[in-house]
A protein has these predicted regions:
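Extracytoplasmic gate region of multi-pass secondary transporters
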Residues: 1-49, 109, 113-116, 140-155
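Juxtamembrane helix-start elements in MFS-like secondary transporters
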Residues: 21-37, 61, 90, 94, ...
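C-terminal ends and interior cores of transmembrane alpha-helices
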Residues: 66-86
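Hydrophobic core of transmembrane alpha-helices in multi-pass small-molecule transporters
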Residues: 86-107
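Paired intracellular helix-loop junctions of major facilitator superfamily
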Residues: 115-126
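Symmetry-related core transmembrane helices of the 12-TM Major Facilitator Superfamily/SLC fold
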Residues: 210-225
Length: 225
């Protein structure tokens, strides 16, 4: 599941925390986040491969699935909390959780050949592993597309919900068109979430931090399958 997140990791970090913790999460921070993903991914290959020699391959993959599902499901809660009560604590948790996820992603790559040998014997490892790598490559292409699609749906839903809470007169004055034309305005990039927040009533929480919640839930489901 982690491979689908790799291509959009920088964007995720910026959109989840950029609006709530702008002094901390900027372009340089997001770029360093991607660098750390690579380092933890590489380190996970050595760490989990070594650990699997002691606890067994099956136990190692059980840890991957259980911890992965738990961490993915905890991220939407983190995003929700940082949007309501911005705190660097939530950023630290998100950062740590995703780094653990990517160590397990790297560890999966490193330990899967040995696990396949344990299950099917060394004679069949080559063919099975080749098919598995093909599936991994496919996920690398389709994963970011699926994540982007889910994010766009969440964005559209958030814009529509927020538009309903904005005074129609304020909306028309700000965007030069009535609220019933919102679909056209969104396609033209005239209406965006940040622009809606400018005229939103007090107390409305910016939903930008939660746009990837459905994505994280999908990642957890994929691990469960």
């Amino acid at each position: 599941a982690g491979i689908g997140v790799l291509g959009v990791a920088k964007t995720m970090m910026t959109e989840i925390f950029g609006t709530t913790l702008p002094k901390t999460v900027n372009a340089n921070f997001a770029a360093s986040y991607v660098l750390m993903i690579s380092l933890f991914n590489m380190g996970g290959r050595f760490f989990w491969a070594s650990v699997s020699d002691y606890i067994g391959r099956k136990t190692t993959f059980t840890i991957f699935f259980v911890c992965g599902i738990t961490l993915y499901l905890s991220i939407p809660y983190t995003a929700q909390q940082v949007s309501v009560s911005p705190s660097i604590v939530w950023l630290i948790y998100f950062y740590s959780a995703t780094m653990v996820i990517f160590t397990m992603y790297g560890g999966g790559f490193a330990t899967i050949p040995a696990y396949l040998a344990d299950l099917f014997g060394t004679r069949f490892v080559g063919g099975i592993h080749g098919r598995l790598l093909t599936a991994w490559s496919t996920a690398g292409v389709l994963g970011p597309l699926a994540i982007t699609s889910l994010r766009e749906r969440s964005l559209q839903r958030s814009i529509e919900q927020m538009a309903k809470q904005v005074n129609p007169a304020d909306f028309a004055a700000h965007f030069g068109a009535p609220v019933d034309q919102i679909q056209t305005l969104v396609l033209q990039k005239t209406v965006t979430l940040s622009k809606l927040m400018e005229i939103a009533p007090r107390g409305i929480v910016d939903p930008a931090s939660t746009l990837y919640n459905s994505t994280m839930e999908l990642m957890a489901c994929l691990l469960g399958v």
